[in-house]
Amino acid sequence: MREVISIHVGQAGIQVGNACWELFCLEHGIQPDGQMPSNKTIGGGDDAFNTFFSETGTGKHVPRCVFLDLGPTVIDEVRTGTYRQLFHPEQLISGKEDAANNFARGHYTIGKEIVDLCLDGIRKLADQCTGLQGFLVFNSVGGGTGSGLGSLLLERLSVDYGKKSKLGFTIYPSPQVSTAVVEPYNSVLSTHSLLEHTDVAVMLDNEAVYDICRRNLDIERPTYTNLNRLIAQVISSLTASLRFDGALNVDVTEFQTNLVPYPRIHFMLSSAPVISAEKAYHEQLSVAEITNSAFEPASMMAKCDPRHGKYMACCLMYRGDVVPKDVNAAVATIKTKRTIQFVDWCPTGFKCGINYQPPTVVPSGDLAKVMRAVCMISNSTAIAEVFSRIDHKFDLMYAKRAFVHWYVGEGMEEGEFSEAREDLAALEKDYEEVGIETAEGEGEEEGME
């Protein structure tokens, strides 16, 4: 088997995790207590879902995941929630006091005490796997636990499981909506280690997902549950090819190979065109239509405009009633569009996956039941907008050394701030250079080598 272990760190990671496992269980016909009634087996005896679930002797299916948090409150909700019987108690690891939005507490003082417990939990899961392909890490970089403990854990995973790929689903601070004053600090400090210790990071941001909920799903006042369910749909589409059999299946390492041209350029934009139940009642969208809308700025899950940048590569994951012929036609149309620009050194740029399992919807959820859907992750130079926004906010605060004493008091050194900030400045520069036309600069290149 090619198993994948999911790691949910901090409040955002855990709540997105809840939405994901709720959806995965529905997709595979697994009940909240982990039982899978034999008559409900979708796809007739397809066991590909074992990449995400392990089966116990009593026929119970347990998610291959751990939930980690420094404070007890969020994990207690899982312990008492609908899916409490799904998880083994050892998979839910929580501490006594939280990181208080402080990267240094999550990474140094408090995180250090709990990280070995976490790694033991992960080791137990890894030992049950026959061919572990890698890890999915869910966290946000604005808070203290997701950023601090999240990056500490990634660093330790690199040491313990060097060759295994690590995919991050990372919630970045939004341009307008903020949940903490020190978000820019936490984000810059933790992106510093995301650069080093993840192979692919998919960027999500709440504001962009809010807008999708409001605009496409007509939800006037979206809650976090609405947001997380939408994010779960994207993650489900990306991982569907690991959990179901399909025509063009995509492995975790395949994402890496096709999307990452240079090791540092691995921050992805994701997009998922969704429509509300009311709209779907009147129209079924064709493959060409959903493909076009995947490239619309309005479908992007992070606040940045892909028209301001160039695409290096993109991965289109279709599910449901889709055949390769339609996909090829849709992609050919995209290539002729002037608004969608690719860098000139990457002429093909498309990787497609097709999965015959149509999207499942959560009962009483907001999404329509549709025949076919697409989800795209793309590597675009436009993502640099996200970094420059955070860097700018970081600079404003750091110029006055505002709030820095909280970090230094937890054992950080001021030098780490400037080191992380310089690393991000270099990253912005990298993105700029990748997007520059190569044809013009050929003469200069030789001088530089």
Swiss-Prot record:
Claim: Disulfide bond is one of the keywords in the record: no
Modification comment: Acetylation of alpha chains at Lys-40 stabilizes microtubules and affects affinity and processivity of microtubule motors. This modification has a role in multiple cellular functions, ranging from cell motility, cell cycle progression or cell differentiation to intracellular trafficking and signaling.
Subcellular location: Cytoplasm, Cytoskeleton
Any GO CC annotation of this UniProt entry: cytoplasm
Sequence positions that bind GTP: Q11, S140, G144, T145, T179, N206, N228
Keyword Transferase appears in the UniProt entry: no
Catalytic activity, EC: 3.6.5.-
One Pfam short name: Tubulin_C
Superkingdom of the organism of origin: Eukaryota
Catalytic residues, chain numbering: E254
Catalytic activity: GTP + H2O = GDP + phosphate + H(+)
Any single biological process term in GO: microtubule-based process
One of the record's GO molecular function terms: hydrolase activity
Subunit structure and binding partners: Dimer of alpha and beta chains. A typical microtubule is a hollow water-filled tube with an outer diameter of 25 nm and an inner diameter of 15 nM. Alpha-beta heterodimers associate head-to-tail to form protofilaments running lengthwise along the microtubule wall with the beta-tubulin subunit facing the microtubule plus end conferring a structural polarity. Microtubules usually have 13 protofilaments but different protofilament numbers can be found in some organisms and specialized cells.
PANTHER family: TUBULIN (PTHR11588)
Chain's role: Tubulin is the major constituent of microtubules, a cylinder consisting of laterally associated linear protofilaments composed of alpha- and beta-tubulin heterodimers. Microtubules grow by the addition of GTP-tubulin dimers to the microtubule end, where a stabilizing cap forms. Below the cap, tubulin dimers are in GDP-bound state, owing to GTPase activity of alpha-tubulin.
Protein name: Tubulin alpha-2 chain
Organism: Stylonychia lemnae
